[in-house]
């Protein structure tokens, strides 16, 4: 059973095909990059996986379950058990680091003790233990990045979706975070779907790459 | 710099003069006016009435406005933009028109009383706190609605999506979306509160004893200009407190906003509840907007009533139109420069200009009007005082905040590098402003013109005090004709006011389309 | 604040005045847009507290007959007389108005006290009884409202006095407008003036004991009586005449006409010449016109049915000529003072 599978997926915006006839499978624990020039539909694919968009045609499966098909979403984002790191990180400015992480756990109905323990673990892994009471705006770019990753991982998702998360960082920080991400993957073994337009990140992060070109996908 | 001077002259000076004169009793500095007025129990009763009215109005407008804003901006409710437009209609005319409309329905001789003998009950209910809350609540609901929609549309969609990955819509709305737009909601609530504290026409029509009406009509402040100012002080204190809150709200927390661009906000599916929600919204629109407007239409749309209205107030309507148009033009120019100042923060104390504009906006028109008379009514300035320019100065002072805020919103959507690029390319200030900035904020300028036009058109308190003799506006004339005028005539005048507001806005709407199509 | 006070006030703000001059150029552009409209040679400016719906046609007639353009500022019903009163007071040092047309004499007398009006004794008011004029000519009364009783035709008792309100036989049958507002306040003040405070307070207490209902306005009182909910009410003559003309089952009774009784309270319009107004001569012409028999006749036959104060002017059938009416003998300046003085008593009585 694949972690993620797309079958003959089409998506059009205002008459223009953004994704056409795209199929791929991602196995559990894989590190896959989705790669392509801008406008090639990378983000659209990610948003369909996350459940924000339904494919016009075709089927999306997660954990073997059909979650969306032919213009209809069957399983909403909150029931897909995915974590996501957004390009702009999307940290909630009105909540502290701790509260940012707590949101998903509260939604799962976990008790305060369990929440505290899980958040403590994840924050330790991204080396941000001491910042749990801090608001995101007070953190550096690299720290914010790690909060976003921690928030995406805290609910122990089936897969982690990342949408060009490093595009706004300088090269040193990029290297550091790449290494850190690979460490985390080695420790936790989640499935990683990583969208990027950078060949370097593609090489570093993925053990497989899906190249989107002319709205079609080619597995590399 | 000139913008600062204009604002200071039209707005700040009259206030200083008023406060000064209120402290000057019989040739010496004295707090007698304050002791007398503020020591009077009735002052505080009225103040309490106003606070109660404003609080209830804010609660009603806030609750309905935020809920509707979320429904319109974030759910897949059908006809959402039409719904927003309908609920915003009351913004186009003075709140007392809604009051007149309700009166036609609920009054002792109203439509309802013809069918069911409850005219006395409904009339008592209308001419009291519930009626005033209903009228002002529906009049100011659009402010909350529009600000909620604006802030929701300006929100970064990924903030919501990040939450959607782990929770359903109710939890996301409660814990993420609404807290994120809290600054916008609070801003709108403070504005509604201040505007209902200062509202003159509707409470006057509904005979509610509130501060702005009574402080100028009751003996406490009567025959004594200084005492009138002293009586206005609690109101000014409330306004200042509200402004401090606004400043805190707006500057306390800096949120990242994503203006314009392709909105990729996911709409909340209402599912099976959709027909029920739609029905509820339509019913609410019918009650809050449809009923009072129908009341006005019903009484006022007879040929005889309309021709009577035109004959009695045709000239006033034209004047209203011209004054509002000229003021809106001037306001947009002024707003451009104030906004530029605030945007570039190039002059020290830029924020004080912004704060002053906001202060004047929320100051009751009656207070501002008296201050302006005190400042300008002087033999040497008679050439201004005795002309319609006086009224327009009042409009400019009162509504500068609107135009500057709207243009500022336009500026903040624009990258500062656009102007810097022109600067590097060697363009002088003049060419930068008129060659680069003006075209870029053209939509905002147009919006500012339309909004200030409507506000000037619907104003009552300033024309009553400042219109030069024989040159009143339609709103003022409607108010003065209400004394023993037939209700058909009053309704027809209100209808005229509604048309007056709708016609140019329709024209702007068309111009807007034409403008945008080539681009 | 007196005239001296105001001058000192202006002197106390040299900065303000200097800045005004310096800023002239800014406003010049505005003024240029609008066009300077001052200095019309043949015009008169009048501030009007009488209802616009009635007063405007009189002013139009004046313009048609004299060719003098009339610039009017009207008042709102709710802020009764306070809009233009505030303007008159605020403009004291640089008057814009030539004439103030008040709908009752008390406020016109305030203008005298504040030094805003100036004496002028119109020739055409010579025949109007002196008790309706200021002795020194600061204001002249004309066309009046009277405080009359309206009685439902089916009423069990026909009251003929304001004292009917405190007659135990009419318990729960009378209605009166809230005495905190309008002409009802004047009525109370007049009774307090004539009777003295003690008897006045007893009357107020009697109203409460006799379960007299308070309405929001005289019009509402008249409607209550017309619909039979109450049997009688003291209202303004225009409200009474209006209901009768619309065929409502009402009778108009002139109260307190008997020997030793107080008579009917008459509230005339009052017109005053403003001191230092820009067009004083035209102002005088307008005053002469307003207090003339012809204007009184027009106002008598208009919907407001006001009572002419000249003897011998034709009146509609619903109202009695002034010379056949026993009127309350009150000095309007005293009435104004009493009106202020009894405010606390009235507020307490109403339960504020």
Summary of predicted features, one role per range:
Chain B
Residues 1-27, 39-153, 180-201, 228-247, ...:
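Membrane-water interface segments at the C-terminal ends of transmembrane alpha-helices
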Residues 78, 168-169, 417, 427-428:
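Short coil/turn motifs that cap or connect alpha-helices
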Residues 197-223, 460-487:
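Glycine-rich helix-loop "coupling/hinge" segments at transmembrane-helix boundaries
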Residues 31, 44, 86, 159, ...:
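Amphipathic alpha-helical segments in well-structured domains
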Residues 156-157, 171, 208-214, 220, ...:
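Feature of multi-pass inner-membrane transport and sensor proteins
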Residues 165, 513-519:
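Short, charged juxtamembrane terminal tails flanking transmembrane helices
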Residues 160-161, 419-420:
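Short alpha-helical segment that forms part of, or immediately flanks, the ligand-binding pocket
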Residues 164, 423:
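Alpha-helical residues within the helix-turn-helix
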């Amino acid at each position: 059973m694949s972690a993620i599978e797309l079958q003959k997926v089409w998506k059009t915006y205002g008459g223009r095909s953004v994704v056409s006839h795209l199929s791929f499978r991602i196995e559990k624990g894989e590190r896959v990059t989705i790669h392509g020039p801008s406008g090639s539909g990378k983000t659209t694919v990610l948003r369909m996986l996350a459940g924000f968009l339904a494919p016009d045609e075709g089927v999306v499966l997660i954990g073997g379950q059909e979650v969306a098909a032919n213009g209809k979403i069957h399983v909403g984002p909150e029931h897909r058990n995915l974590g996501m790191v957004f390009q702009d990180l999307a940290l909630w400015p009105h909540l502290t680091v701790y509260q940012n992480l707590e949101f998903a756990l509260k939604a799962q109905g976990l008790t305060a003790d369990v929440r505290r323990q899980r958040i403590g673990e994840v924050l330790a892994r991204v080396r941000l233990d001491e910042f749990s009471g801090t608001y995101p705006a007070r953190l550096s770019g690299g720290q914010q990045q790690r909060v976003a990753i921690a928030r995406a991982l805290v609910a122990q998702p089936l897969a982690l979706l990342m949408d060009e998360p490093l595009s706004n960082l300088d090269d040193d920080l990029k290297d550091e975070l790449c290494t850190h991400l690979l460490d985390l993957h080695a420790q936790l073994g989640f499935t990683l779907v990583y969208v990027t337009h950078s060949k370097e990140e593609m090489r570093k992060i993925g053990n497989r790459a899906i190249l989107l070109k002319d709205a079609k996908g080619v597995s590399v | 710099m000139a913008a600062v001077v204009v604002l200071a002259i039209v707005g700040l000076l009259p206030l200083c003069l008023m406060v000064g004169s209120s402290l000057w009793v019989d040739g010496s500095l004295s707090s007698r006016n304050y002791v007398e007025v503020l020591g009077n129990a009735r002052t505080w009763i009225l103040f309490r009435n106003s606070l109660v009215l404003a609080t209830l109005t804010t609660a009603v407008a806030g609750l309905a406005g935020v809920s509707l804003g979320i429904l319109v901006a974030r759910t897949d409710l059908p006809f959402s933009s039409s719904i927003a437009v309908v609920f915003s209609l009351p913004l186009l005319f003075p709140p007392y028109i809604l009051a007149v409309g309700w009166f036609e329905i609920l009054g002792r001789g109203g439509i309802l009383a013809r069918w069911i003998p409850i005219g006395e009950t409904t009339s008592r209910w209308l001419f009291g706190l519930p009626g005033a809350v209903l009228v002002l609540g529906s009049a100011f609901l659009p402010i909350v609605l529009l600000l909620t929609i604006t802030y929701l549309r300006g929100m970064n969609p990924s903030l919501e999506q990040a939450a959607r990955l782990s929770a359903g819509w109710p939890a996301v709305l409660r814990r993420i979306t609404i807290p994120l737009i809290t600054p916008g909601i609070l801003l709108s609530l403070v504005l509604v509160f201040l505007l209902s504290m200062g509202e003159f026409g509707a409470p006057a029509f509904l005979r509610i004893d509130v501060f702005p009406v009574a402080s100028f009509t009751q003996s406490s402040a009567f025959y004594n200009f200084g005492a009138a100012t002293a009586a206005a002080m609690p109101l000014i204190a409330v306004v200042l407190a509200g402004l401090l809150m606004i400043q805190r709200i707006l500057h306390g927390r800096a949120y990242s906003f994503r203006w314009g661009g392709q909105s990729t906000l996911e709409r909340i599916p209402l599912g099976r509840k959709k027909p029920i929600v739609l029905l509820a919204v339509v019913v609410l629109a019918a009650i809050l907007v449809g009923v009072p407007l129908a009341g006005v239409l019903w009484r006022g749309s007879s040929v005889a009533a309309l021709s009577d209205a035109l004959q009695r107030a045709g000239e006033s309507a034209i004047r209203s139109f011209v004054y509002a148009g000229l003021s809106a033009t001037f306001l947009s120019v002024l707003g451009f420069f104030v906004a530029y100042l605030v945007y570039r923060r190039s002059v020290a104390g830029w924020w004080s200009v912004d704060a002053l504009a906001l202060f004047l906006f929320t100051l009751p028109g009656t207070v501002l009007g008296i201050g302006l008379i005190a400042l300008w009514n002087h033999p040497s300035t008679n050439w201004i005082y005795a002309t319609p320019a006086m009224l327009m100065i009042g409009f400019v002072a009162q509504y500068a905040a609107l135009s500057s805020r709207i243009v500022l919103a336009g500026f903040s959507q624009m990258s500062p590098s656009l102007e810097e690029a022109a600067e590097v390319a060697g363009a002088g200030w003049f060419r930068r402003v008129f060659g680069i900035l003006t075209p870029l904020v053209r939509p905002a300028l147009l919006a500012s013109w339309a909004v200030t036009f409507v506000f000037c058109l619907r104003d009552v308190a300033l024309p009553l005090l400042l219109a030069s003799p024989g040159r009143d506006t339609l709103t003022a004339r409607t108010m003065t004709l209400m004394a023993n005028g037939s209700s058909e005539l009053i309704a027809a005048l209100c209808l005229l006011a509604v048309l007056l507001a709708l016609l140019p806005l329709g024209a702007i709407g068309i111009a807007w389309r034409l403008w945008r199509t080539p681009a | 604040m007196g005239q001296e006070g105001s001058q000192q006030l202006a002197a106390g703000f040299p900065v303000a005045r200097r800045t005004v001059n310096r800023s002239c150029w800014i406003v010049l552009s505005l003024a240029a847009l609008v066009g300077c409209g001052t200095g019309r040679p043949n015009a008169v400016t009048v501030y009007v507290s009488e209802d616009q719906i009635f007063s405007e046609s009189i002013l139009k007639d004046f313009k048609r007959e004299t060719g003098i353009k009339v610039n009017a500022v009207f008042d709102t019903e709710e802020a009764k007389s306070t809009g233009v009163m505030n303007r008159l007071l605020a403009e004291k040092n640089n008057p814009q108005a030539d004439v103030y047309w008040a709908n009752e004499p008390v406020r016109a007398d305030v203008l005298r006290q504040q030094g805003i009006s100036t004496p002028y004794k119109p020739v055409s008011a010579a025949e109007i009884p002196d008790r309706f004029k200021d002795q020194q000519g600061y204001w002249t009364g004309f066309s009046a409202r009277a405080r009359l009783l309206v009685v439902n035709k089916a009423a069990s008792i026909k009251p003929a006095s304001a004292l009917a309100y405190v007659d135990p036989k009419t318990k729960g049958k009378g209605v009166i407008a809230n005495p905190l507002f309008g002409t009802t306040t004047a009525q109370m003040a007049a009774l307090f003036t004539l009777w003295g405070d003690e008897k006045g307070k007893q009357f107020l207490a009697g109203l409460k004991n006799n379960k007299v209902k308070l309405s929001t306005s005289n019009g509402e009182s008249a409607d209550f009586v017309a619909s039979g909910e109450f049997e009688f009410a003291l209202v303004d003559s225009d409200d009474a005449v209006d209901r009768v003309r619309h065929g409502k089952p009402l009778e108009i009774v002139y109260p307190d006409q008997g020997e030793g009784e107080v008579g009917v309270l008459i509230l005339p319009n009052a017109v005053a010449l403003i001191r230092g107004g820009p067009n004083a001569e035209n102002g005088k012409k307008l005053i002469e016109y307003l207090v003339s028999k012809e204007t009184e006749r027009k106002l008598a036959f208009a919907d407001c049915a006001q009572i002419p104060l000249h003897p011998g002017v034709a009146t509609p059938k619903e109202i009695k000529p002034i010379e056949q009416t026993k009127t309350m003998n009150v000095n309007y300046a005293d009435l104004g003072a009493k009106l202020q003085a009894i405010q606390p008593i009235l507020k307490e009585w109403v339960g504020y």
